[in-house]
Structure formats: C-alpha cells, structure tokens
C-alpha cells in the first residue's frame, strides 16, 4: 500500500464530495431559504410600516377630536355662564320690582292707592321688546324710506308692496308709480276725490281714517278709564293730560285749555310727576313747554267756514263772551281705529269742530298692532302721541294720532312746524308736554275750525287714531269691534242706528 501525498488526497476528496452532493439542489435550497427570509422580512417590515402609519393617523385623529371636544366644551360653558347670568339678573330685577310695590304706589283721592305705569308684567318677551331702541329704529326706517329709488325699480317694488299689504292702486290720484320717488311718497299717497264719501248729517260721526275698529265704548265717568282691550284699561287723564274729571266739569266750548298753574298741578298729580320747585326730588319733574300759537297763515279759515262752525256750535254759545252752561245727559265715548300698512294713511276731521290745543307727548314707539294692544298694558299712554283738543256742538272733542314702530312722523297740515320722533333737541326733554294753541286761526272761535271730511294730516306707514268725545246719551255706535272701515264711513249717530 502506497502512501498518497497529502496534496493529492485533498484534491481527490474534493472531487468525490462534489460528485456525491447534488449541486443544483443545494443551490436551490439556498435560494429558497434566502427568498423566504427576504419575503418574511418584507412582510414583517410592511406590516410594521402599516401599523406605524395607522398608529400615527389615529394619534392625529384623536388629537383633532380632543381639540374639537375642548372647543365645544368651551362654547357650551360660555352659553351656560351667559344664560345663568341672564337668569340671575332677571330674577334680581323682578324681585326688586316686586319689593318696590309700595314705593311705586301713590296715594290718591279717598285713600285709594294707584300704581305707576308698568310696561310688562313678568313677561320676558315684552321686557326684551321694551329695551329695544325703537325710536332710533323708526328714524332709521324713515331715512331708508326716503332714499330715492331707481325709476325701473319703482313699479315692481310698489306692486310687490301692494300685493303683500292689499293696497288698492285703482284709488290713487296719480296712478303712475314711477312718479313716487321713494317709499315715503308712496305710503303718503293721495287718493282720487270722491273715493271716500263722507257720511252726512250733523249728528253723525264719520271715521277719521281707513282702518280696523279695535275698540269702541263709553269712558267710565267715575274713573276716567278707557278700555284698551277686554280687561285692560288706561286713563284718559294720562292719555290726554286733561282735568281731573272726565267731563271737565263744564262744557268744552268754554274750556280754557291753555296752560295754567292749576291744570299743571292736576296733570302732575295724575301722572305722578313732581312739579318744579317741590321739596320732594325723588320723582321726575314735569315741564310744560308752551310753544305759543302755531297757526299757519296759509290755513286761515274763510269767513264762510267760521260762520258754518258758529252755527254748528251755537248750541253751547249765547250772548257775548261765548260762555256756556253745564252739559246735561251726556257721556264720554271713545273709538280706537288701527291703520294697517296698506291703508290710506291720511286722517280727516270726523265732525265739524274747533281744534284749540295741540299737546305733544314724546314717548316710545312700540308697535300698535292688535297683538301688542291685547298684551301690552298702557300701550297708548307709553307711546308718542299728539292730542288735539277742542269742542263740537255737544261739548268736548279730541282726536289723538298715536305713534308706532317705524312710523317716523305724524304730520299736521295746519301746524307745519310740528315734527314727531325728531333727533333734534326740540322735543326730546323727558317728562315734558309740548303744548301749542291755534287762537290766531280764528279769533271768533278761538281755534282752528275743521269741517267734517277735511284733511288734517297723516302718518307715514300706519298707526292708530283714538277719538274721545262728549255726546248725548242717545249716541250709538254703528260699528263693531273688528270691523274694517273706510275714511268717511259712519261710526255712530245720535239717536237710531243701523247696527243689527
């Protein structure tokens, strides 16, 4: 046995080994193992990447949700705090008002206590409504209405308004809608002569305006209360600022309605307002502003008109000085007429009478719509109003246009300097009655003669007219509450009526 060199033996062993091992299978197994490892690594790394992406997205979403919830919680907390503060403040106000009942009450005649006027009775709706700047809003609305409209807009806009509020365009004196430069001119439009026939008869009272009858009746001669709606009244003394007794203790044809100390004191007592110079300074002062004679020369009546009114008023006149006797068998009646936005906005004289005094009571401009009249106590006493006082053949007669929201102006044809709801300082002093007379219009009659059907003035948009007049007990109304009337239509008659 020969010994093989080491080098040759190693070479031979390598050859034998390579011959016995399947080289292809070995390489394949190595490739499969490597591929499996790669795929495993890829699968693992992809899943991890997806998980990482998902986890990062969830973190972002959770952060956004947390921020949104935090914002909602902050907003909710703000509303909770605001609501709680409002409730607490309102409770304090209500409690303080209830606790001050004795302070609000004043001692009247016969030991009877009366309470001051309140604009709400534990009603949040009217309380919030009463805090709105309605006078400023009405002035702004008046400025908007006075803006000149493009000619092409006018027919479309006015027809739309007429459709919404039931305006009868066929009655217009000037049917060309392009001639009305703005809404104010369209609101204050004139109607054709003869469109509103006036009820004739010396004992007939005609409607002073278009509108809806809200209330008619008799004024309580003991308390002087006027029924605003069923179960809700206001005082004629607070409404007109007249003497203590509703019938004024003497016929209106001889009433001296000009300013005098006794009347001022009575008016201050009725309205629970202290006169200047009094020792008690807790109550607001009453200032009577006498504006003198405001007669307009252009409206000076003719001789025939004076004679006609003298003949109508002769029942209460005799001898020189035009003194008169006490009225007998008479009562005070009232009628309330609401003018809707679509109505004819001018008001006319309902009877032959003499307007002697104009009293302007600046006030608020709450809405006088029927809903507010049913639910808002003392609405007419709180609102701005112009009381026109005088006399007719049966005694006292008054006609009072009452302002309302978005009614920026009450116009009087025979008092052109008179302006209501003005931003100027002319009529802005609180607790002040601005009074004027019309003696120079007729020296004989002592006031402005007005015949039935004569135009006196008007509103811009719509409002309310209140009539308070003295008449024989035989007077009967010819209309019912809720009836719609036209200017000149018969409201009532002394004697028989046609109401069934």
UniProtKB/Swiss-Prot annotation:
Reaction equations catalysed: a 1,2-diacyl-sn-glycero-3-phospho-L-serine + H(+) = a 1,2-diacyl-sn-glycero-3-phosphoethanolamine + CO2
Post-translational modification: Glycosylated at Asn-34 in the endoplasmic reticulum.
Molecular function terms from GO: phosphatidylserine decarboxylase activity
Glycosylation sites: 34
Presence of the UniProt keyword Ribonucleoprotein in the record: no
Parts of the chain on the Mitochondrial matrix side: 45-79
Topological domain ranges for the Mitochondrial intermembrane compartment: 99-500
Induction: Repressed by inositol.
Descriptive protein name: Phosphatidylserine decarboxylase proenzyme 1, mitochondrial
Organism lineage string: Eukaryota, Fungi, Dikarya, Ascomycota, Saccharomycotina
Gene designation per UniProt: PSD1
């Amino acid at each position: 046995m020969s010994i093989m060199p080491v080098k040759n033996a190693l070479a031979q062993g390598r050859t034998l080994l390579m011959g016995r091992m399947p080289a292809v299978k070995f390489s394949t197994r190595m490739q499969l193992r490597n591929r499996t490892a790669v795929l495993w690594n890829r699968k693992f790394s992809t899943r991890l990447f997806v998980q990482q992406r998902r986890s990062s997205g969830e973190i972002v979403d959770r952060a956004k949700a947390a921020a949104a919830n935090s914002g909602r919680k902050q907003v909710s907390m703000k509303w909770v705090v605001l609501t709680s503060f409002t409730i607490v403040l309102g409770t304090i106000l209500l409690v303080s008002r209830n606790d001050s009942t004795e302070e609000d009450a004043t001692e009247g005649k016969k030991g009877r206590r009366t309470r001051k006027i309140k604009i709400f009775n534990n009603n949040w709706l009217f309380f919030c409504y009463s805090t709105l700047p309605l006078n400023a809003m009405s002035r702004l609305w008046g400025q908007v209405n006075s803006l000149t409209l493009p000619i092409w807009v006018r027919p479309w806009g006015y027809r739309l308004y007429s459709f919404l509020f039931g305006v009868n365009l066929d009655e217009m004196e000037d049917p060309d809608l392009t001639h009305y430069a703005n809404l104010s001119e369209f609101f204050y439009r004139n109607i054709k002569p003869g469109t509103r026939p006036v009820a004739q008869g010396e004992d007939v009272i005609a409607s002073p305006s278009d509108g809806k009858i809200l209330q008619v009746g008799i004024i309580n001669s003991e308390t002087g209360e006027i029924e605003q709606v069923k179960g809700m009244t206001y005082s004629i003394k607070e409404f007109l600022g007249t003497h203590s007794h509703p019938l004024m203790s003497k016929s209106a044809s001889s009433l001296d309605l000009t300013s005098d100390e006794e009347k001022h004191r009575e008016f201050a007592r009725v309205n629970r307002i202290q006169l200047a110079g009094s020792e008690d300074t807790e109550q607001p002062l009453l200032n009577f502003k006498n504006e003198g004679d405001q007669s307009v020369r252009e409206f000076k009546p003719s001789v025939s008109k004076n004679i006609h009114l003298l003949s109508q008023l002769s029942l209460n006149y005799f001898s020189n000085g035009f003194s008169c006797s006490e009225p007998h068998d008479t009562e005070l009646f009232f009628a309330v007429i609401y003018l809707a936005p679509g109505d004819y906005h001018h008001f006319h004289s309902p009877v032959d009478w003499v307007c002697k005094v104009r009293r302007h009571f600046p006030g608020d401009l709450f809405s006088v719509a029927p809903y507010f009249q049913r639910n808002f106590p003392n609405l007419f006493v709180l609102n701005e109003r112009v009381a026109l006082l005088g006399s007719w053949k049966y005694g006292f007669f008054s006609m009072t246009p009452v302002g309302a929201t978005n009614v920026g102006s009450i116009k009087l044809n025979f008092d052109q300097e008179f302006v209501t709801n003005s931003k100027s300082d002319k009529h802005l002093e609180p607790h002040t009655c601005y009074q004027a007379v019309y003696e120079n219009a007729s020296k004989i009659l002592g006031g402005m003669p007005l015949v039935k059907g004569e135009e006196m003035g008007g509103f811009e948009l719509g409002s309310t007219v209140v009539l308070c007049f003295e008449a024989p007990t035989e007077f009967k109304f010819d209309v019912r509450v809720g009836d719609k009337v036209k200017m000149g239509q018969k409201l009532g008659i002394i004697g028989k009526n046609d109401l069934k």
